[in-house]
Amino acid sequence: MELILLEKVANLGNLGDKVKVKAGYGRNFLLPFGKATVANAANLAAFEERRAELEKAAADKKSSAESRAAQLAELEVTITATAGDEGKLFGSIGTHDIADALTASGVEVAKAEVRLPNGTIRQVGEYDVAVHLHSDVEATVRVVVVAA
């Protein structure tokens, strides 16, 4: 299935690229989420007319993500949780908890943007957490977990 990308897609291509993908990936992900359109003559012409508009929208998204990353870089979030004597938490701190704490401190962050590659936080301490704001923009936030 040949598609024209309407925005940058990780591990696939950039805006305007004509790519060949498996039918399921195109039908179930790229087309329904508006990330691509079918590559035919009519859609190619329509895309070329809208190219400047789409590039401006992509640049706006990236600049917005960069400004949020600058705000996050100087931010340190403290999360209080109940813990045992040795610092082991009763429960865990996940992406949802971190996103809520960041939003409460003034920077809007969705839970899908928070990356915890080693799984949830289960110990009291300081952690550097990656926040993936855009395909080209990633920020690191210091999260301090303290016992209640």
UniProtKB/Swiss-Prot annotation:
PROSITE patterns the record matches: RIBOSOMAL_L9
Highest taxon, organism lineage: Bacteria
Keyword Methyltransferase: no
Function: Binds to the 23S rRNA.
GO molecular function: rRNA binding; structural constituent of ribosome
Transmembrane stretches, start-end: none
Keyword Metal-binding appears in the UniProt entry: no
GO biological process, one term: translation
HAMAP family reported for this sequence: Ribosomal_bL9 (MF_00503)
Membership in a protein family: Belongs to the bacterial ribosomal protein bL9 family.
Native source species: Pseudomonas putida (strain GB-1)
Name by which UniProt lists this protein: Large ribosomal subunit protein bL9
Keywords: Ribonucleoprotein, Ribosomal protein, RNA-binding, rRNA-binding
